[in-house]
């Protein structure tokens, strides 16, 4: 291998490393958006569009500096390593202390995108320099550059969800990525550009890179303390457990006897009043004959806890996407769910609910007597598909002929369109539906949809052999089916995979 070939290979390797780092910064901000803002389609679109637009802006803004490509490249990579490395910590701290706006994240994305966009013109200029490549064919140079750039992006895209985020978290992961960015700049400066920029400029560049690396090292060391301090400011009660899983940020808080679970910042339950929600969700779907029950979502184990109180229920299949939620249900939340997920009658399946419904494997004879759908609110397209016409059609394949389905459907008062959209979508899927709602102090007015196949809507009833309940009675349930004039039933178009209308209903906000 000639010296020129080695230089070219080393520079292309640096291109791949820088591309990987750039995409990781972008994914870190998208992950942060999901944690702080819910990660809706609008937020994701704004961040991605802002990043892509900034790439073009960076390519234009760097044009006057192409005559000094070597030192400009080192400066850009230094800034990118520092700003990208600090981005997650800075955004998290800003949100925790002063509150945050989506536009702050978009601005951060634009700055990083501008710096990333400047890389390709600079590298193209360096690769065409006689002292660096000796190549005269601009098309071949551009092809090699693009190949290295796209390969690096692939590496970064795979590294973030499977390696960096699970192992390091957002703040430390972004900082380590910044260190890699700085290292790539240092390698290029020492081995490729020293003959171009001169010893004095090289020494200055290395000094700045070293100082930046030391700063990021300090951030890595302090990241746990920074994150725990800033995270605690987002929650009123002391945090007792935290995990950033591959799917979401999970936080458990506790004050006295009140334990609360949050997913991506959204409250899932409070032990102060979750029994109102859980009893209202579970018991109307059971009737007096339900022996096999499918629970989709509900990985906290609270629904399973109530099901196990019914003596005739002999089989519970619990399908939960996130193994981290199951681990917490068996750990810090064990007291809340009475160890339900470790009961031999409960089969825990870690899978996406829709994927599992397509290939559910062995089913109880005749199908499940009851299906309880306890999923987070559909505030993004990933969750929206679990409230779609196609999803409910899959549910019919595993449901017994006379079985009942219950769906947690959000607040009929605060998000009425989303609530009635769920009811209408179930109806379009071939179910006869009875909506009902109860007051849960933590959530406010909260609604459910009880459904069976056919044209005869079920009447919500408390099973005769139900154990003593703290909230639900037949009188409460009868009243729950009545809706006042300011929240009268609506018939809406169904939400589908092609047109997830329910996500737009949620995005429209709370009245």
Residue ranges and their predicted role:
Residues 292-298, 461-465:
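Short alpha-helical "patches" and their helix-cap loops
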Residues 1-242, 246, 254-257, 261-265, ...:
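Alpha-helical transmembrane segments of multi-pass membrane proteins
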Residues 248, 455-511:
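SAM/dcSAM-binding transferase cores
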Residues 272-276, 380, 461:
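Solvent-exposed, non-transmembrane alpha-helical starts
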């Amino acid at each position: 291998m000639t010296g020129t070939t080695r230089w070219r290979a080393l520079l292309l390797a640096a291109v791949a490393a820088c591309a990987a780092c750039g995409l990781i910064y972008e994914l870190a901000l998208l992950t942060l958006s999901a944690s702080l803002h819910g990660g809706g389609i609008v937020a994701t679109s704004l961040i991605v569009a802002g990043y892509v637009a900034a790439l073009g802006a960076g390519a234009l803004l760097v044009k006057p500096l192409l005559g000094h490509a070597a030192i400009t490249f080192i400066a850009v990579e230094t800034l990118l390593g520092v700003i990208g490395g600090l981005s997650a910590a800075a955004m998290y701290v800003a949100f925790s202390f002063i509150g945050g706006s989506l536009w702050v994240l978009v601005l951060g994305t634009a700055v990083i995108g501008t710096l990333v966009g400047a890389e390709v013109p600079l590298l193209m200029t360096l690769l065409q320099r006689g002292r660096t490549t000796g190549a005269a064919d601009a098309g071949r140079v551009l092809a090699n550059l693009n190949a290295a750039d796209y390969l690096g992006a692939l590496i970064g895209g795979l590294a973030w969800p499977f390696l960096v985020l699970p192992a390091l978290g957002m703040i430390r992961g972004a900082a380590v990525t910044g260190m890699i960015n700085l290292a790539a700049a240092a390698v290029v400066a020492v081995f490729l550009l020293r003959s171009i920029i001169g010893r004095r400029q090289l020494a200055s560049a290395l000094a700045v890179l070293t100082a930046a690396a030391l700063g990021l090292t300090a951030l890595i060391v302090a990241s746990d303390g920074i994150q725990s301090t800033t995270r605690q400011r987002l929650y009123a009660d002391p945090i007792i457990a935290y995990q950033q899983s591959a799917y979401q940020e999970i936080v458990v808080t506790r004050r006295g006897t009140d334990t609360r679970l949050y997913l991506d910042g959204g409250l899932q339950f409070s032990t102060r009043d979750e029994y109102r929600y859980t009893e209202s969700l579970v018991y109307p779907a059971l009737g007096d004959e339900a022996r096999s029950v499918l629970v989709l979502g509900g990985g906290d184990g609270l629904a399973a806890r109530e099901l196990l109180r019914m003596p005739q229920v002999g089989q519970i299949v619990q399908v939960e996407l996130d193994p981290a939620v199951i681990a917490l249900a068996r750990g810090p939340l064990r007291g809340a769910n009475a160890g339900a997920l470790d009961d031999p009658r409960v089969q825990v399946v870690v899978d996406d609910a829709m994927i599992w419904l397509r290939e559910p494997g062995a089913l109880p004879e005749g199908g499940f007597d009851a299906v309880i759908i306890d999923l987070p609110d559909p505030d993004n397209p990933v969750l929206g598909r679990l409230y779609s016409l196609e999803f409910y059609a899959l549910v019919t394949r595993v449901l017994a002929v006379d079985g009942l389905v219950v769906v947690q459907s959000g607040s009929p008062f605060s998000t009425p369109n989303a609530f009635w959209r769920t009811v209408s979508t179930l109806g379009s899927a071939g179910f006869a539906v009875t909506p009902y709602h109860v007051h849960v102090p933590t959530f406010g007015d909260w609604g459910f949809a009880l459904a069976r196949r056919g044209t005869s809507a079920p009447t919500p009833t408390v099973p005769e052999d139900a154990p003593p309940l703290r909230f639900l009675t037949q009188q409460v349930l009868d009243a729950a089916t009545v809706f006042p004039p300011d929240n009268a039933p609506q018939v809406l178009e169904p939400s589908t995979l092609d047109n997830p209308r329910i996500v737009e209903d949620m995005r429209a906000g709370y009245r």
